């Protein structure tokens, strides 16, 4: 099973993004078991420092993980790949991961040290900074693209 875990709220995402994200999730499910879990955003964060906020979000992220999960952080400091390389990466993971493969998008300040320690890998979708809702959409689109590449679908063109 592939899982995308997100720190944040559905309330902060526009309907147009939700529609597009759900469309790619449904398309991707033709090829593999895929689920998206939203970890609730923290309340009353204005009084919290960035480090405290990362720690609290990190506790919620770690609580959502299961023993044996292979954890991949979507992080600006992670490895960058072209779409073809990501498809090959997914193929390797699907052939070797016995439990869940969990991709995590962090909160506005990134991840806590404990979440970095729990991670097996880091991937970057771009060196640019994107909004949380954009990253959700970009990731699910790239996951769908990877599945069509692996299955010979007409979606991807080189």
Which residue ranges define each predicted feature?
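A short, Lys/Arg-enriched amphipathic alpha-helix followed by its capping loop at the start of a domain
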Residues: 20-31
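Rossmann-fold NAD(P)-binding glycine/threonine-rich loop
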Residues: 106
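Structured adenosyl-cofactor binding patch, chiefly the S-adenosyl-L-methionine
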Residues: 113-157
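Short, structured coil segments at secondary-structure junctions
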Residues: 7-8, 32, 118-119
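Glycine- and acidic-residue-enriched helix-capping/strand-helix junction motifs
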Residues: 14-19
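S-adenosyl-L-methionine/SAH cofactor-binding core of RNA-modifying enzymes
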Residues: 33-99
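Single conserved hydrophobic/aromatic residue that forms the stacking wall/gate
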Residues: 1-13
């Amino acid at each position: 099973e592939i899982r995308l875990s997100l720190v944040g709220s559905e309330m902060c995402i526009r309907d147009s993004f939700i529609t597009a994200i759900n469309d790619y999730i449904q398309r991707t499910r033709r090829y593999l078991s895929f689920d998206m879990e939203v970890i609730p955003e923290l309340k009353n964060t204005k009084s919290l420092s960035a480090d405290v906020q990362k720690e609290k979000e990190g506790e919620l992220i770690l609580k959502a993980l299961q023993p044996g999960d292979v954890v991949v952080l979507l992080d600006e400091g992670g490895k960058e790949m072209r779409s073809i390389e990501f498809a090959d990466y997914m193929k390797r993971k699907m052939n070797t991961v016995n439990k869940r493969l969990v991709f995590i998008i962090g909160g506005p300040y990134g991840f806590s040290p404990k979440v970095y320690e729990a991670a097996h890998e880091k991937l970057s979708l771009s060196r640019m900074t994107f909004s949380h809702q954009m990253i959700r959409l970009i990731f699910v689109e790239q996951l769908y693209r990877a599945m069509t590449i692996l299955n010979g679908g007409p979606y991807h063109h080189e």
